[in-house]
């Protein structure tokens, strides 16, 4: 089994953690933006079927 030879420094660990958090926050922002555009009907990437009223 692979074992690291030396301990990872605190600064390197913090940098990697911030990159990981940044990717998550970016994905959440994109998901929120897509949800907003779908709810307002301004989405250009999704086609949502409109319900037809029979009355």
Swiss-Prot record:
For this chain, one GO molecular function annotation is:
structural constituent of ribosome
Query: Pfam families, from UniProt?
Result: Ribosomal_L32p (PF01783)
Coarsely, its chief localization is plastid
Q: What Gene Ontology cellular-component terms does the record carry?
A: chloroplast; large ribosomal subunit
The places in or outside the cell where this protein is found are:
Plastid, Chloroplast
GO biological process entries: translation
| Record key words, sorted | Chloroplast, Plastid, Ribonucleoprotein, Ribosomal protein
Tell me which InterPro entries the record gives: Ribosomal_bL32, Ribosomal_bL32_plant/cyanobact, Ribosomal_zn-bd
Q: Which PANTHER family match?
A: 50S RIBOSOMAL PROTEIN L32, CHLOROPLASTIC (PTHR36083), LARGE RIBOSOMAL SUBUNIT PROTEIN BL32C (PTHR36083:SF1)
Similarity remark: Belongs to the bacterial ribosomal protein bL32 family.
Q: Report the protein name in the record.
A: Large ribosomal subunit protein bL32c
What does the record give as the organism's lineage?
Eukaryota, Viridiplantae, Streptophyta, Embryophyta, Tracheophyta
